[in-house]
Amino acid sequence: MDWLEFYPAVFVTALLFSALYTPLCKKLAWKLNILDVPKCEQHKLHAKATPLLGGLSMFLSFLSVIILTALGRGIQLRYFPGLTEGLKGVSLALPQFCVLVACAAAAVLLGLYDDKHSMKAWKKLIGQILIAAVTATWGGVSITLFIGIPFISWCITVFWIVFIFNAINFFDNMDGLAVGTATIAFIFFACAALGADDF
């Protein structure tokens, strides 16, 4: 039961960090002129110049929660003693988790560079494929459903990660659409994990 109590605490903490970082990133975007200019791309519907760096705010919130969780392990176990057994599994998966965090950071840096310098599509695609390949190879992420051949599974995983990259990236035509879609996906995966008793 402790996990069901712990996750809402993590969620609220991330929400608070996001509320802190979002206005700061907004100010930084205006200062550095990292803006989404209206009608610069056909699918964008902004009526006026809009500050970017929303992805940076989300990543900083994610990273802050990870750091806070790592530093506050003793406090967690005091209030959520049921986490003890699960944390052993977290320790075993730590190398893969570090790879995932590093790949997430690389994706954010790639996005920031693109926001500022408007990369050519093929260059951005190469960067995304490299990040996805590292994630699929060393990050412990693999799509194996109905697939028994490791190489085919790896290729599908890389394709899927790149697909998600661009799906979320394409949702930047309206404010809040990307984060709203990501929230719906989060709720779906949370329900699936809860149904499978997989914390």
Please give the residue ranges for each predicted region.
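"…together with the soluble PPM/PP2C metallo-phosphatase catalytic core" -> "…together
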Residues: 2-199
